[in-house]
């Protein structure tokens, strides 16, 4: 009799464990990210080969895109996308970070950094939870450097 209770208890424990695992898997949502028009370009394939393994100690997260030109790290997600049109002249601040020019555009919930003088452009969205946001940009230097610098530079 006790044997039946034990095996029923073991089955119940196994079922509950499986339900918890499935629930956790279903709870894993991916970050919604739009794929830029030039994401499939040779330049973006080259840049994507240099995405950082971690950003500020944060590991990669799943995104809604299967494109290698789109990547996310951390929660809230730090998002990088390659394949955007190049940024034209702007009054937004322009920063030189380790030889890579970035235009910083303040958003309500963080900062959008876009490479300047590179075609196609790379965009990095940094939520305000990661202040000061520019400190994360060195992680993207190798990816940005994979796209040649054009004539435009930060002043």
What spans do the regions from the language model cover?
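Sequence contexts marking disulfide-bonded cysteines in secreted/extracellular proteins
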Residues: 29, 43-45, 81-84, 93-95, ...
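A short, surface-exposed helix-loop junction/capping segment
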Residues: 28-34
